């Protein structure tokens, strides 16, 4: 997962660092500056791709961040804290543009402590950020007696998403927190879910994710499966087939077979089912271009159980 740093001690500015342990981050940036990285690793991220932002001018710094991460690979992006509405909009546009250009990742956002006290404000932020590739956390958390806004706790959620397999859901996943910033009523929880917000709840024993949703109201699990497929198939084709096979019936059949084999491996891991891979009948495959029609159904997780009790 990817994370820009605005505070990083004596570390070199304008540089990428790959962090796998909190101790590495503390040595590089100072113990009092590793909070966002600590949250990401505690959430489950195997490693954090951190970038030390060199500009101290807001507009320039965010442009620098987008430009720097443009050439790097990652599956989830998050800021270390809440950002302005303008930069949220700019980042959303960046996520959308990257998707259109073939680079697929989720972005996680949050808000301020003040915003977290009114779920309607968080839900409005969700509406503004509505997209298949964006997650908006609207509740903060208390950790070891200290309160954190949803913006500052967002790196934990980003780490949780990044570290969860694409065949698993983060719904009801417990998080490392002692309480939520504000406990919402059932009606507020229902309203937030209908908007596509991601929220934390305290169930009386622990703090957990209520439901793993992106801001378009779809499930994170399904979107991450699509992202993996959209990333892996072009990469596999480029590495093993492009420039190595003739664009003939035999070459096309070999490519189709390879794509099917990849999807079937995902099917065995309960990621998807109902696989279809054929040549696209609406676009002619000729010259150096092959157009495939790929269809599948994401495997859903059991997230809600309805019981009827007769007495």
Tell me the role of every PLM-derived stretch.
Residues 1-311:
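Surface-exposed assembly/interface segments
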């Amino acid at each position: 997962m990817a994370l820009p740093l605005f505070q990083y001690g004596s570390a070199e500015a304008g540089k990428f660092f790959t962090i796998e342990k909190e101790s590495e981050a503390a040595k590089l940036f100072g113990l009092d500056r590793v909070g966002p990285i600590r949250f990401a690793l505690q959430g489950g991220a195997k490693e954090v791709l951190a970038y030390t932002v060199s500009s101290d001018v807001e507009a320039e710094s965010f442009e620098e961040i987008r430009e720097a991460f443009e050439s790097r690979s990652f599956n989830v992006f998050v800021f270390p804290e809440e950002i302005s509405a303008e930069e949220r909009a700019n980042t959303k546009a960046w996520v959308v543009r990257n998707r259109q250009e073939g680079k697929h990742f989720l972005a996680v956002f949050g808000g301020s402590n003040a915003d977290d006290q009114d779920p309607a404000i968080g839900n409005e932020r969700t509406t503004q950020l509505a997209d298949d590739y964006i997650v908006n956390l609207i509740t903060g958390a208390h950790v070891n007696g200290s309160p954190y806004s949803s913006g500052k706790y967002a790196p934990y959620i980003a780490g949780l998403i990044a570290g969860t397999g694409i065949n698993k859901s983060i719904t009801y996943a417990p998080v490392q927190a002692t309480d939520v910033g504000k406990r919402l009523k059932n009606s507020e929880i229902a309203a937030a879910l209908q908007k596509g917000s991601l929220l934390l709840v305290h169930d009386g024993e622990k703090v957990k994710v209520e439901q793993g949703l992106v801001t378009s109201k779809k499930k994170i699990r399904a979107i991450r499966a699509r992202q993996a497929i959209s990333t892996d198939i072009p990469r596999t084709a480029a590495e093993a087939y492009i420039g190595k096979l003739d664009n003939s019936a035999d070459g096309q059949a070999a490519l189709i077979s390879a794509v099917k084999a990849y999807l079937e491996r995902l099917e065995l891991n309960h990621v998807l089912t109902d696989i279809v891979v054929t040549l696209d009948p609406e676009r002619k495959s000729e010259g150096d271009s092959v157009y495939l029609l790929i269809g599948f159904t994401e495997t859903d997780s059991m997230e809600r159980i309805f019981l009827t009790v007769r007495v």
